[in-house]
């Protein structure tokens, strides 16, 4: 497995993975409004635009197939984090690579936040995040605000 910054032209593969995992695991618990809101966020053109601004995306690859992705906004917020097959170490490796990328860019590790899907809370807790508030809902998307301290 190799982890690299997403390159121009790879956005379609990234979004295909994101949508496949979302459809299988997260969408069944969302309202129609929530699914539509997420699909609007997880569009190739929107990922391209975010990448030109203050986001970066890392992709875990195996034989030219994406295994997982993590998108970081403003060096302090996890925007998207999806792994095709959980409990194989891909998520942990992606997260560690994202932390190294942040350190490389700013010289230290900022505190991080995430709006975790309900089923992802235990995974984020294993990565050192803690719950900051109860379940929130915005535009049909249910999430738990979580944070992790910096260095």
Predicted regions and their residues:
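A short beta-loop-alpha structural element at the N-terminal edge
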Residues: 2-16
């Amino acid at each position: 497995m190799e982890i690299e910054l997403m390159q121009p032209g790879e956005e379609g593969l990234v979004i295909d993975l994101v949508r496949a995992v979302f459809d299988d695991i997260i969408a069944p618990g969302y309202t129609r409004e929530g699914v539509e809101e997420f699909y609007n966020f997880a569009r190739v053109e929107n990922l391209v635009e975010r990448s030109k601004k203050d986001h970066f995306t890392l992709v875990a690859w195996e034989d030219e197939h994406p295994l997982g992705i993590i998108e970081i906004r403003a060096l302090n917020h996890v925007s998207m984090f999806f792994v095709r097959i959980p409990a194989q170490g891909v998520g942990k490796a992606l997260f560690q690579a994202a932390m190294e990328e942040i350190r490389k860019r700013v010289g230290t590790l900022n505190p991080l936040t995430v709006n975790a899907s309900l089923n992802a809370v235990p995974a984020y807790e294993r990565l050192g995040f803690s719950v900051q508030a109860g379940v929130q809902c915005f535009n049909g998307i249910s999430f738990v605000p979580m944070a992790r301290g910096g260095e």
